[in-house]
Regions:
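Assembly/oligomerization scaffold segments
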Residues: 1-120
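Short acidic/polar beta-strand-loop edge motifs in secreted extracellular
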Residues: 120-141, 156-183, 317, 377
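Residues forming anionic-ligand binding surfaces in small-molecule and nucleic-acid pockets
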Residues: 111-126, 146-155
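Short beta-strand-centered interaction patches in the first periplasmic/extracellular domains
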Residues: 106-111, 115, 154-229
Length: 379
């Protein structure tokens, strides 16, 4: 990519291997997106012509990925910045696009893929029972199937656990592993995603609440002359986003529904702003009356977490000027934006674009209030 940044590309089934120099020379652009919600993805664009050896290489590679008996083609991207190698993406190939060259101009082959959660979405396991297993145990058991891909499960118990009693009910899976795990996450207000680990060829399958605590990344500086390290940064505040969900728990004796307001109680999502967004309206969740109390409260927490982030920001930066790779699903500081918008933010998504001579990132930030709760943020 440049003299200060080195990109390594590994491709292969299950355990990928470094690609030949022919592929690296033909690689024009890399785009990688990590987001706090949904699957992450990548796109690789190669420059080719009709006589290029790359056509044969891709035919062989894709031909090995055409049935359930063969594993998906795995793609790993590793970035070395400042002498430190860190995995940028670990996923599988899902689509190959070819654009033919015209007027003596070279064509291109575009490889598109998703993170390793895609391998959990290939086979339907509907009907598989999980007797007497809490949700986090079910998630750990499901993720254990994919240890060959280097996936390490990290399930966090629900704030209000609901352990099924076998003589009353036995939970059964519906759909693929990925669909079922996401359904479980939705029920208890958790998120599920797979992201590259600290060591190449390993990934963390995280099932739990969004973590908005921990050491923040170096600050994004705006309008600070020589200390400015972002190309652009824009903010917005939506005062109507605050919603207080109200769940209904049925009294087993009288059958009368009891309304209970549910604030955002997640200890891993403390306020990042001193002035929280006002409660704009109430959301009556009447469907929760048919659930048991633990399930109803978990459904309320799931709804409460969606309506807290009234402050958002978007921007872009040059990685060489920033000095490191900005990571999604982490905290980051902001300086120079004014009293209302300075402070800590949660990085909800990052799109990294690499080409020869450049490495840029565009990002989205969120926060649940105005005015910083800390007098200083790490530089």
């Amino acid at each position: 990519v440049s003299s200060a940044i080195h990109l390594s590309l590994l491709i292969g089934p299950i355990v990928p291997i470094p690609v030949p120099a022919l592929l690296i020379d033909a690689l024009e652009e890399v785009s990688v997106t990590h987001a706090s919600e949904g699957a992450s993805g990548f796109q690789l664009r190669f420059k080719v012509n009709s006589h290029s050896e790359l056509n044969t290489l891709f035919l062989i590679a894709v031909g090995n990925n055409t049935s359930l008996g063969t594993p998906p083609l795995r793609v790993v991207l590793i970035v070395t910045l400042g002498g430190r190698a860190q995995p940028l993406f670990d996923g599988v190939l899902t689509h190959v696009g070819v654009q033919a060259g015209q007027d003596r101009q070279a064509g291109s082959i575009t490889l598109t893929g998703e993170d390793l959660s895609k391998v959990m979405d290939l086979i339907d396991f509907s009907g598989l029972p999980y007797p007497a297993m809490p949700i986090e145990a079910r998630v750990a058991l499901i993720c254990a199937k994919y240890a060959a891909f280097g996936i390490i499960p990290l399930p966090i118990p629900a704030l209000f656990p609901d352990v099924p009693i076998p003589i009353e009910r036995i939970p059964a899976q519906q759909g693929t592993d990925l669909a079922y795990v996401r359904q479980l996450a939705e029920e208890v207000g958790h998120v599920f995603y797979i992201e590259p680990g600290e060591v190449p060829l390993t990934s963390i399958a995280y099932f739990g609440p969004e973590i908005k605590v921990g050491p923040p990344q170096p600050a994004l500086n705006v309008d600070m002359d020589a200390h400015t390290n972002v190309e652009s940064l824009n903010f917005s505040f939506d005062p109507t986003k605050g919603v207080l969900p109200v769940v209904y728990i049925q009294n087993p004796q009288t059958r009368a529904p009891i309304p209970i307001p549910i604030p955002n109680l997640n200890p891993l999502q403390p306020p990042l702003g001193a002035l929280s967004a006002p409660i704009a309206n109430l959301k009556m969740m009447k469907d929760t009356a048919k659930l048991n109390p633990m399930q109803a409260i978990s459904a309320g927490l799931a709804e409460a977490k969606k309506s807290q982030d009234a402050v958002s920001a978007s921007g872009s930066l040059d990685v060489l000027r920033y000095g490191r790779v900005l990571r999604a699903r982490r905290l980051v500081g902001v300086r120079g934006a004014g009293v209302a918008y300075d402070g800590l933010y949660y990085v909800s998504s990052v799109t990294s674009t690499l080409a020869r001579g450049k490495f840029t990132q565009s990002f989205q930030l969120t926060r649940n209030g105005l005015v910083s709760i800390t007098p200083r943020v790490p530089a």
